[in-house]
């Protein structure tokens, strides 16, 4: 029997490799479908691109949630539980697979599967970056081609049988969840529970990034979501500062400023991270930028500069002690054999002056303690 006719989908051919059990499941909106998959090229070697079994955990999607690779929902809803089938899908269905694959690989590496940390997600990501970070996926992106998916359907859960994660919510539910998550993150931050606070901010960011992929980049609604996202990312960075994860703060804040160079708080938070890793010049430059953009933050800037001066002085003292210890250890070593040649005449140049302490003229940005209050929930749904 021609399975392509049964699916009634152009550009799809199905071959059942192992029959399933029972009747066809009742796939309804909100059903969770759990499955293993293997993606291959249509070349002679049947080159494997991705394999969920190698990752060590199955994949799952929610029916009706506009999954990135829409054809997978069609394929899965044609299957019985425990069925194994091979699907050949033409290029019209596989063009966005490289973007999905990148998300899956990020997840396998323990990173956020929605890639919020690079401040763009899905198709919107392609407007800001020209590579997916994987050579084979870049090739697929440039030259889309038919792909083969081998899928094993493991389980189908009704909407009432499992607890839905925030990223599985509808568009309207996500928008309602964001201010709640934001406010909870702020509450936890004030209690000093920075790990839990950062998780709440991350959840809110994931919701907004998912919504943002459904908007045209740089148009009004996309920019509104971007502003909300940047606020949450900076709150998340304040948690990272408390957890002493300074280089990740530098990564996130620098990425924000590449796209939105007028965000004062991003300069302030980045300055604090630079100061913690003794990047004196960079910290002072960011604090100076804070003053240029927001002169009213002069008091906070001065405070940060004093802290920077103290930190640099402590570092210089540590270096002097280290050098002194090295010299004292060298003095206890047996004297070296005298050189056979007369030593060269010593230089009469005076020793270099020690660096002066940095001046105290800068420091700003909202203090890290009170995290930004959550924005009011927008009054309209972003469902598409």
Curated annotation (Swiss-Prot):
TPR repeat ranges per the UniProt record: 178-211, 230-263, 264-297
Tissue: Highly expressed in retina. Specifically localized to the developing photoreceptor layer and within the photoreceptors of the adult retina.
Gene Ontology BP term (one): apoptotic process
Pfam family for this entry, one: PPIase_AIP
Stored SUPFAM superfamilies: FKBP-like, TPR-like
Domain PPIase FKBP-type: 53-145
InterPro entries per the UniProt record, alphabetical: AIP/AIPL1/TTC9 (IPR039663), PPIase_AIP (IPR056277), PPIase_dom_sf (IPR046357), TPR-like_helical_dom_sf (IPR011990), TPR_rpt (IPR019734)
An annotated GO cellular component: photoreceptor inner segment
Record's subunit section: Interacts with NUB1.
Full protein name: Aryl-hydrocarbon-interacting protein-like 1
Provenance organism: Homo sapiens
